[in-house]
Curated annotation (Swiss-Prot):
Residues 1-63 form a transit peptide. It catalyses: L-methionyl-[protein] + [thioredoxin]-disulfide + H2O = L-methionyl-(R)-S-oxide-[protein] + [thioredoxin]-dithiol. Pfam families: SelR (PF01641). The lineage of its organism: Eukaryota, Viridiplantae, Streptophyta, Embryophyta, Tracheophyta. This is Peptide methionine sulfoxide reductase B1, chloroplastic. It comes from Arabidopsis thaliana. Binds 1 zinc ion per subunit. GO terms for molecular function: metal ion binding; peptide-methionine (R)-S-oxide reductase activity. The gene is MSRB1.
Amino acid sequence: MASSTRLTIIQSSFVSARTRLNYVSKTNHSGFACRSLSKPRNLSLSVYSMGSSSSSPKPDNVQEAEKNEFASLSENEWKKRLTPEQYYITRQKGTERAFTGEYWNSKTPGVYNCVCCDTPLFDSSTKFDSGTGWPSYYQPIGNNVKTKLDLSIIFMPRQEVVCAVCNAHLGHVFDDGPRPTGKRYCLNSAALKLNALEKTRD
């Protein structure tokens, strides 16, 4: 009887500890570009023309060829191509301060490309106001981005978002975004380059 009581207490303690861990994981996000969100607001409100090629996923054979090209670049070559901030963010996995990036509050329609290799990554129609101070999107363009496990913060595993072509660090993705994907791709402005689109003429 005593053994059964001790087992019940141990099980209850384990469930309680796991609940506290989940709570901490959710509430400690604000300092790492991953604050819980209120109702997101889509930032693309006007109808604009869009060429199909500008926001299309790259074919696998094209991606592979470009991967080989960019994989051969040395760190010094990247430094020559990028500004110090761009290099820090994309090649050293840095994070810009919230509410300081060029695109965090941008409502300009267009396609956001990788600043390193010009691969189209996100369409402005998937951009929304996350309230975090970083540009946020709910869906990438095709397979032009990929994710991998980031264990750089102890007890807080995250999913890093990188360019599928040149492996540039873009930001992180979280499961608190809007419909239809429920994803929030929280990115650094310095990793992006906006190709703005012109209004459709009547």
